[in-house]
Amino acid sequence: MTNKAHISLAEIKAPLASELDKYEEFMHKALHSESPYFNDILQYIFDNRGKGVRPTLVMLFAGLYNGGAPFGERVHLAASLIELIHTASLVHDDIIDKATMRHGQASVNTKWGGRNAILTGDFILSRIFELGMESLEFDILTYVSHTIKWLCEGEVIQDEQTKTLAMTHERYFDIIDKKTASLLAISCGVGALAVKAPAAEVDKAYTIGRAVGMAFQIKDDILDYAAADQTGKPTCADLREHKITLPLLEAMAQMSAEEEAATRTLVGRGDDEAIGEIYAKVVKYSGRERAEGIMADYIASAKTALINYPASPYRTALEAMCDFLAQRKH
């Protein structure tokens, strides 16, 4: 592979070349309805998916444990179920957040309305259980279904914290563990499970994935304080929704009690002037840099654990994935 500073997701996926087409075929069948109108919505979602980080993690961990042998349908099923969970959560998130765009295209709720978007997300969730039951791979279905519960819990806890402006480091890490890290952790764990790795190895893969997932969300929260031309997103979008994330928590940890209280009041206001003041405080107290340090610790933890696996293209790709996620600009 090329230098880690210039690694691309396509290069990371290179060891999976013989399996990606099979996964894509499985996913296309999963996102299908007999209704032509409904199928138009599902095809739109299929055509406008994101980077595919989570199913890639599933397959890389499967490769890590099966020694490069052909995967078989269990792995393609596991990767597809993970991507379906992620896809359904994004459709529902866009409704909750009233988001008009997703991956540079109109969101489903913008294009087809909120009612159809809700039903589309529900349909995708139903396909997860239908595919799992039809395949009789109950161990995989049971394992991945846990994350649906955790995603919902994380959203509700975050909503409560947003209303009270009482976010703390402990609550923040609990929220991102449930909202984001859980799905990446399950992605890695189910990759091992799909090739029938021992339970202890599944747990080990899960732990690595959790560290990657925590870093992934922290990076997202750091990017929210970056310039809009770097991310393609509105600067401080979370603050506009009264969300306190790690860069601000790290900045507030350096403040006096009085200044911290005043800053939380500014978050509650959420207007442009207040956001400008908060942004200046995050810069003043090196909130982004401190958050970067915490993110780097999670990445280092994941990479240290990966060193214990035998050298292989899959291990190399997973190490590169850690660098890719840490260095991404959007």
Where are these regions (language model features)?
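All-alpha prenyltransferase/terpene-synthase fold signal
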Residues: 1-330
